[in-house]
Amino acid sequence: MPLKLDVSRAEGIAIVKCRGRIVFGEETDDLRRTVLGLLKETKRIVLNLALVPHIDSCGLGTLVASFISARNREAEIKFAALSPKARRVLGITKVDQLFEVYESTEEAIQSFHPRPKAAVR
């Protein structure tokens, strides 16, 4: 299944819904180009991986490279709704400790809006 990337925006945040495998070839090239293009427009991106059935080593490298590209531009990429297989790959490789991972896109969006601290009396 080729990778399809649906980009939307909410609250100034780019949301990329990935559908299909993130594997060596056009898939990783498309994802890399999409993320780099979005980083020219915004400092906040959420990658939704709910519909990603497989990530190979090149796909994993692309996710890490995208994360680093964002960080180098003082931007943030957060991950949301990982499919069971995506969660497994990120967990086995310990990459999930590098990324901020949220159960849903909504939670990832909210994480960009820190709650005000309570007043101290």
Q: What is each residue range found by the language model?
A:
Residues 15, 87, 119-120:
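Intrinsic disorder/low-complexity segments
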Residues 6-8, 80, 102:
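General small-molecule cofactor/ligand-binding pocket signal
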Residues 101-121:
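A charged, well-structured terminal subsegment
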Residues 4-33:
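STAS-typified acidic loop motif
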Residues 12, 84, 106:
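Residues that form or immediately flank small-molecule/cofactor binding pockets and catalytic motifs
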Residues 23-99:
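Amphipathic alpha-helical interaction surfaces in cytosolic regulatory modules
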